[in-house]
Amino acid sequence: VFQPFFMNLIEGILQANPRAMARAMSLIENQDPQARDILKALFPSTGRALVIGVTGAPGSGKSTLVDKLAHEFRRQGKTVGIVAVDPTSPFSGGAILADRVRMSAHYNDGGVFIRSMATRGHLGGLSRAAAQILSVLDAAGKDIILLETVGVGQDEIEVVKVADVSLVVLVPGMGDDVQAFKAGIMEIGDIFVLNKADYPQVE
């Protein structure tokens, strides 16, 4: 029999209560024993959100693009969840939270939920718990979930496993063409975005 706390938490998530969502995400990230039961209870309410993975090299402008996409989806009347996977601070073990600073314009918008996560040393561009965090946002009824990875390297292509659409952000001048197409990341993209297109290298 589930405890009242558990039932209230599940009910809160299904009603898109930000506090309940944040609490569940913290339990998931901290590998709390209750996390498994939470995800099991939420599972029947998942599978409706469109998950867009945004990946690319460090400094390519992923956060800015995610911010603009969120603005556009909100303009269309859709609710948005944003999961920004940040590098882990070597001192605190937590997320550096650089991405949330860039997305501050959404803080007062009840239709946008933003969560930063630390990789906690996990290779692959995604936190171990990222897919489970997506389930919470999905169950909460978010129409669109934007998943921004850590600036990835050649082998860090986990985003394709959890995203419905993979969006790769490229910047002119960052490595020659051969290097780019050797990289595994070029093989996973459904959409390629050439950012900072006003750079002289574009020509």
Which stretches of residues belong to each language-model region?
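GTPase G-domain guanine-specificity segment
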Residues: 94-98, 197-203
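Hydrophobic positions on the alpha1 helix immediately C-terminal to the Walker A/P-loop
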Residues: 65
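Aromatic (phenylalanine/tyrosine) cluster motif
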Residues: 2-6
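Nucleotide-state-sensitive switch-loop elements of NTP-binding domains
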Residues: 8-52, 60, 69-155, 162-177
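Conserved SF2 helicase motif VI
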Residues: 182
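Conserved beta-strand/loop subsegment of P-loop NTPase cores
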Residues: 165-170, 185-198
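P-loop (Walker A) phosphate-binding loop of NTP-binding proteins
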Residues: 57
